Amino acid sequence: MFFKKNLTTAAICAALSVAAFSAMATDSTDTELTIIGEYTPGACTPVVTGGGIVDYGKHHNSALNPTGKSNKLVQLGRKNSTLNITCTAPTLIAVTSKDNRQSTIVALNDTSYIEKAYDTLVDMKGTKNAFGLGSAPNGQKIGAASIGIDRSNGGIHAADDTGEIPVDLIQTDHWSAATPTWKASSNGAFCSLTSCSAIERGYSVAKTGELTPVAITAVTFPLLIDAAVNDNTILGSDETIKLDGNVTISVQYL
Protein backbone atom coordinates (compact mmCIF):
# COMPACT_ATOMS: atom_id res chain seq x y z
CA MET A 1 0.00 0.00 0.00
CA PHE A 2 1.63 3.20 -1.12
CA PHE A 3 0.84 6.73 -0.03
CA LYS A 4 2.17 9.95 -1.48
CA LYS A 5 2.11 13.14 0.55
CA ASN A 6 2.18 16.61 -0.97
CA LEU A 7 4.02 19.53 0.66
CA THR A 8 5.56 17.29 3.31
CA THR A 9 8.45 17.87 5.71
CA ALA A 10 9.83 14.75 7.49
CA ALA A 11 10.29 11.01 6.91
CA ILE A 12 8.47 8.17 8.64
CA CYS A 13 8.07 4.48 8.09
CA ALA A 14 6.00 2.17 10.28
CA ALA A 15 5.16 -1.52 10.04
CA LEU A 16 2.24 -3.39 11.57
CA SER A 17 2.31 -7.18 11.77
CA VAL A 18 -1.00 -9.04 11.75
CA ALA A 19 -1.16 -12.70 12.81
CA ALA A 20 -3.71 -15.08 11.24
CA PHE A 21 -5.15 -17.64 13.67
CA SER A 22 -6.96 -20.90 12.95
CA ALA A 23 -9.82 -21.94 15.25
CA MET A 24 -9.13 -25.62 14.60
CA ALA A 25 -5.34 -25.82 14.84
CA THR A 26 -2.60 -24.93 17.26
CA ASP A 27 -0.17 -23.82 14.57
CA SER A 28 -0.35 -20.39 12.97
CA THR A 29 0.75 -18.69 9.79
CA ASP A 30 1.63 -15.05 9.60
CA THR A 31 1.37 -12.24 7.13
CA GLU A 32 2.51 -8.65 7.28
CA LEU A 33 0.87 -5.34 6.47
CA THR A 34 3.31 -2.51 5.93
CA ILE A 35 2.26 1.11 6.17
CA ILE A 36 4.64 3.57 4.60
CA GLY A 37 4.84 7.27 3.84
CA GLU A 38 7.44 9.92 3.18
CA TYR A 39 7.71 13.47 4.43
CA THR A 40 10.39 15.24 2.41
CA PRO A 41 12.66 17.86 4.00
CA GLY A 42 12.20 20.28 1.12
CA ALA A 43 9.15 22.36 0.26
CA CYS A 44 8.84 23.64 -3.30
CA THR A 45 7.11 26.70 -4.70
CA PRO A 46 6.02 27.03 -8.35
CA VAL A 47 5.69 30.48 -9.91
CA VAL A 48 4.65 31.34 -13.48
CA THR A 49 6.04 34.60 -14.82
CA GLY A 50 3.72 37.50 -15.50
CA GLY A 51 1.58 36.64 -12.52
CA GLY A 52 0.50 33.47 -14.29
CA ILE A 53 -1.38 35.42 -16.97
CA VAL A 54 -1.02 34.71 -20.69
CA ASP A 55 -2.67 37.67 -22.44
CA TYR A 56 -3.72 37.51 -26.08
CA GLY A 57 -4.76 41.16 -25.96
CA LYS A 58 -7.80 43.04 -27.28
CA HIS A 59 -8.86 42.80 -30.92
CA HIS A 60 -11.82 43.64 -33.12
CA ASN A 61 -14.28 40.81 -33.70
CA SER A 62 -13.37 40.83 -37.39
CA ALA A 63 -10.14 39.05 -36.40
CA LEU A 64 -12.37 36.00 -35.89
CA ASN A 65 -13.79 35.97 -39.41
CA PRO A 66 -13.90 32.50 -41.04
CA THR A 67 -10.48 31.34 -42.19
CA GLY A 68 -11.58 30.16 -45.64
CA LYS A 69 -9.12 27.28 -45.26
CA SER A 70 -9.45 23.57 -44.60
CA ASN A 71 -8.55 24.24 -40.95
CA LYS A 72 -11.66 25.94 -39.59
CA LEU A 73 -10.12 27.24 -36.36
CA VAL A 74 -8.75 30.79 -36.21
CA GLN A 75 -5.14 30.63 -35.04
CA LEU A 76 -4.26 33.04 -32.22
CA GLY A 77 -0.56 32.24 -32.36
CA ARG A 78 2.08 31.51 -29.77
CA LYS A 79 2.74 33.01 -26.36
CA ASN A 80 5.73 32.32 -24.13
CA SER A 81 5.89 32.02 -20.38
CA THR A 82 8.17 30.46 -17.78
CA LEU A 83 7.54 28.13 -14.87
CA ASN A 84 10.08 28.59 -12.07
CA ILE A 85 10.22 26.11 -9.19
CA THR A 86 12.35 26.67 -6.09
CA CYS A 87 12.80 24.23 -3.21
CA THR A 88 14.21 24.71 0.28
CA ALA A 89 16.29 21.52 -0.07
CA PRO A 90 17.11 19.08 -2.89
CA THR A 91 13.77 17.46 -3.72
CA LEU A 92 12.43 14.92 -6.20
CA ILE A 93 9.43 16.40 -7.97
CA ALA A 94 7.05 15.97 -10.86
CA VAL A 95 5.02 18.72 -12.54
CA THR A 96 1.39 18.02 -13.40
CA SER A 97 -1.44 20.08 -14.86
CA LYS A 98 -5.21 20.23 -14.40
CA ASP A 99 -7.61 21.92 -16.81
CA ASN A 100 -10.22 23.93 -14.91
CA ARG A 101 -12.12 24.61 -18.15
CA GLN A 102 -12.18 21.07 -19.49
CA SER A 103 -15.87 21.18 -20.39
CA THR A 104 -15.23 24.04 -22.84
CA ILE A 105 -12.58 22.37 -25.02
CA VAL A 106 -13.41 22.52 -28.73
CA ALA A 107 -12.94 19.06 -30.23
CA LEU A 108 -9.81 18.88 -32.36
CA ASN A 109 -9.60 16.85 -35.57
CA ASP A 110 -8.32 16.98 -39.14
CA THR A 111 -10.39 20.08 -39.98
CA SER A 112 -10.19 21.87 -36.62
CA TYR A 113 -6.75 21.93 -35.04
CA ILE A 114 -3.99 24.01 -33.47
CA GLU A 115 -1.22 24.66 -35.96
CA LYS A 116 2.49 24.29 -35.15
CA ALA A 117 2.16 23.43 -31.47
CA TYR A 118 4.93 22.61 -28.98
CA ASP A 119 8.63 22.83 -29.75
CA THR A 120 8.16 20.22 -32.49
CA LEU A 121 5.78 22.56 -34.39
CA VAL A 122 3.32 19.70 -34.90
CA ASP A 123 -0.30 20.28 -35.89
CA MET A 124 -2.27 19.31 -32.80
CA LYS A 125 -5.33 17.33 -33.88
CA GLY A 126 -5.98 15.40 -30.66
CA THR A 127 -8.36 16.74 -28.05
CA LYS A 128 -6.91 14.91 -25.04
CA ASN A 129 -3.89 17.23 -24.80
CA ALA A 130 -5.99 20.37 -25.24
CA PHE A 131 -7.08 22.92 -22.64
CA GLY A 132 -10.39 24.80 -22.72
CA LEU A 133 -10.74 28.56 -23.26
CA GLY A 134 -14.18 29.14 -21.77
CA SER A 135 -17.52 29.86 -23.43
CA ALA A 136 -18.82 32.73 -25.55
CA PRO A 137 -21.89 34.75 -24.46
CA ASN A 138 -24.03 32.58 -26.74
CA GLY A 139 -22.87 29.45 -24.89
CA GLN A 140 -20.60 28.10 -27.63
CA LYS A 141 -17.16 26.75 -26.73
CA ILE A 142 -14.52 29.32 -27.66
CA GLY A 143 -11.56 27.16 -28.59
CA ALA A 144 -8.61 25.16 -27.35
CA ALA A 145 -5.02 25.72 -26.29
CA SER A 146 -1.89 23.61 -26.05
CA ILE A 147 0.71 24.01 -23.33
CA GLY A 148 4.16 22.52 -23.61
CA ILE A 149 7.63 22.70 -22.11
CA ASP A 150 10.18 24.09 -24.56
CA ARG A 151 13.14 21.72 -24.70
CA SER A 152 14.94 23.60 -27.48
CA ASN A 153 18.01 25.81 -27.12
CA GLY A 154 18.91 24.53 -23.66
CA GLY A 155 16.09 26.50 -22.08
CA ILE A 156 15.56 24.10 -19.17
CA HIS A 157 17.85 24.95 -16.26
CA ALA A 158 18.17 23.12 -12.95
CA ALA A 159 20.31 23.28 -9.84
CA ASP A 160 20.94 21.26 -6.70
CA ASP A 161 22.77 22.24 -3.53
CA THR A 162 26.11 22.14 -5.38
CA GLY A 163 25.09 24.48 -8.20
CA GLU A 164 23.69 24.22 -11.73
CA ILE A 165 23.40 20.75 -13.24
CA PRO A 166 22.81 19.78 -16.90
CA VAL A 167 19.44 18.05 -17.26
CA ASP A 168 17.05 16.47 -19.75
CA LEU A 169 13.26 16.59 -19.60
CA ILE A 170 11.69 13.25 -18.73
CA GLN A 171 8.05 12.23 -18.42
CA THR A 172 5.83 9.55 -16.95
CA ASP A 173 2.20 8.77 -17.68
CA HIS A 174 1.62 7.46 -14.14
CA TRP A 175 3.34 9.86 -11.78
CA SER A 176 1.50 8.62 -8.64
CA ALA A 177 2.54 4.98 -9.12
CA ALA A 178 4.77 3.48 -6.45
CA THR A 179 7.56 3.23 -9.02
CA PRO A 180 6.75 5.44 -12.03
CA THR A 181 8.24 4.48 -15.38
CA TRP A 182 10.13 7.42 -16.86
CA LYS A 183 11.12 8.08 -20.45
CA ALA A 184 12.59 10.90 -22.50
CA SER A 185 9.95 13.46 -23.40
CA SER A 186 8.92 13.49 -27.05
CA ASN A 187 7.36 16.96 -27.18
CA GLY A 188 6.88 18.33 -23.65
CA ALA A 189 3.09 18.38 -24.03
CA PHE A 190 1.08 19.03 -20.88
CA CYS A 191 -1.79 16.59 -20.53
CA SER A 192 -4.46 17.59 -18.02
CA LEU A 193 -5.15 15.18 -15.17
CA THR A 194 -8.85 15.86 -15.79
CA SER A 195 -8.97 15.06 -19.51
CA CYS A 196 -6.24 12.51 -20.25
CA SER A 197 -8.06 9.21 -19.84
CA ALA A 198 -6.05 6.66 -17.81
CA ILE A 199 -2.99 8.93 -17.93
CA GLU A 200 -1.35 10.84 -15.08
CA ARG A 201 1.19 12.84 -17.07
CA GLY A 202 4.04 14.21 -15.01
CA TYR A 203 7.31 15.89 -15.96
CA SER A 204 10.62 15.91 -14.15
CA VAL A 205 14.29 16.37 -14.94
CA ALA A 206 17.12 13.86 -15.01
CA LYS A 207 20.84 14.34 -15.33
CA THR A 208 21.75 14.53 -19.01
CA GLY A 209 21.66 11.09 -20.58
CA GLU A 210 19.76 9.50 -17.68
CA LEU A 211 16.08 8.63 -17.11
CA THR A 212 15.84 8.84 -13.32
CA PRO A 213 14.54 12.03 -11.67
CA VAL A 214 17.21 14.05 -9.91
CA ALA A 215 16.65 16.01 -6.70
CA ILE A 216 16.72 19.74 -7.39
CA THR A 217 16.64 23.00 -5.46
CA ALA A 218 15.54 24.99 -8.51
CA VAL A 219 14.34 24.35 -12.04
CA THR A 220 13.17 26.59 -14.87
CA PHE A 221 10.77 25.33 -17.53
CA PRO A 222 10.12 27.59 -20.55
CA LEU A 223 6.46 27.21 -21.57
CA LEU A 224 4.92 27.42 -25.03
CA ILE A 225 1.22 28.26 -25.29
CA ASP A 226 -0.61 28.00 -28.62
CA ALA A 227 -4.31 28.70 -29.03
CA ALA A 228 -6.99 28.47 -31.71
CA VAL A 229 -10.67 29.43 -31.59
CA ASN A 230 -13.93 29.04 -33.46
CA ASP A 231 -14.81 31.80 -35.93
CA ASN A 232 -17.43 34.47 -35.35
CA THR A 233 -20.12 32.61 -37.28
CA ILE A 234 -20.11 30.23 -34.31
CA LEU A 235 -19.13 32.54 -31.46
CA GLY A 236 -21.20 35.51 -32.60
CA SER A 237 -20.19 39.07 -33.47
CA ASP A 238 -22.56 41.20 -31.37
CA GLU A 239 -21.01 40.69 -27.92
CA THR A 240 -17.51 40.73 -26.45
CA ILE A 241 -15.84 37.33 -26.46
CA LYS A 242 -13.42 36.84 -23.58
CA LEU A 243 -10.89 34.03 -23.41
CA ASP A 244 -11.17 32.32 -20.04
CA GLY A 245 -8.66 29.48 -19.93
CA ASN A 246 -7.57 28.38 -16.47
CA VAL A 247 -5.00 25.70 -15.66
CA THR A 248 -3.61 24.55 -12.32
CA ILE A 249 0.07 23.58 -12.46
CA SER A 250 1.12 21.50 -9.46
CA VAL A 251 4.38 20.30 -7.96
CA GLN A 252 4.06 16.67 -6.88
CA TYR A 253 6.57 15.10 -4.52
CA LEU A 254 8.11 11.80 -5.55
UniProtKB/Swiss-Prot annotation:
Keywords: Cell membrane, Membrane, Signal, Transmembrane, Transmembrane helix. The keyword Methyltransferase does not apply. The chain crosses the membrane at residues 213-229. It is a single-pass membrane protein. One of its GO terms (cellular component) is outer membrane-bounded periplasmic space. It is found in: Cell membrane. Residues 1-25 form the signal peptide. It comes from Escherichia coli (strain K12). Induction: Repressed by H-NS, induced by LeuO. A monocistronic operon. This is Protein GltF. To E.coli YhcF. Involved in induction of the so-called NTR enzymes in response to nitrogen deprivation, as well as in glutamate biosynthesis. May mediate the glutamate-dependent repression of the GLT operon. Pfam families: DUF1120 (PF06551).
